[in-house]
């Protein structure tokens, strides 16, 4: 997975991610620091999603960020 967008601009994007996934805590986002795999794991944990669903959600989020630029 190409997570350059997430890791490269994490500070700016964290607010959008928090708005999208409100069940994740500020600490979750601090630890994630743009790491897409960690973020996927937290989505699985908090939302009860399987790995594929969490990966799909993160990829869709990345795509929405690319489309915004």
Swiss-Prot record:
<dbReference type="InterPro" id="IPR026042">
    <property type="entry name" value="YjbJ"/>
</dbReference>
<dbReference type="InterPro" id="IPR008462">
    <property type="entry name" value="CsbD"/>
</dbReference>
<dbReference type="Pfam" id="PF05532">
    <property type="entry name" value="CsbD"/>
</dbReference>
<dbReference type="InterPro" id="IPR050423">
    <property type="entry name" value="UPF0337_stress_rsp"/>
</dbReference>
<comment type="similarity">
    <text>Belongs to the UPF0337 (CsbD) family.</text>
</comment>
<protein>
    <recommendedName>
        <fullName>UPF0337 protein XAC4007</fullName>
    </recommendedName>
</protein>
<dbReference type="InterPro" id="IPR036629">
    <property type="entry name" value="YjbJ_sf"/>
</dbReference>
């Amino acid at each position: 997975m190409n997570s350059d967008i997430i890791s490269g601009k994490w500070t700016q994007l964290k607010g959008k991610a928090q708005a999208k996934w409100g069940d994740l805590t500020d600490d979750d986002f601090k630890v994630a620091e743009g790491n897409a795999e960690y973020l996927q794991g937290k989505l699985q944990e908090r939302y009860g999603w399987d790995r594929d669903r969490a990966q799909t959600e993160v990829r869709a989020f990345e795509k929405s960020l690319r489309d915004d630029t």
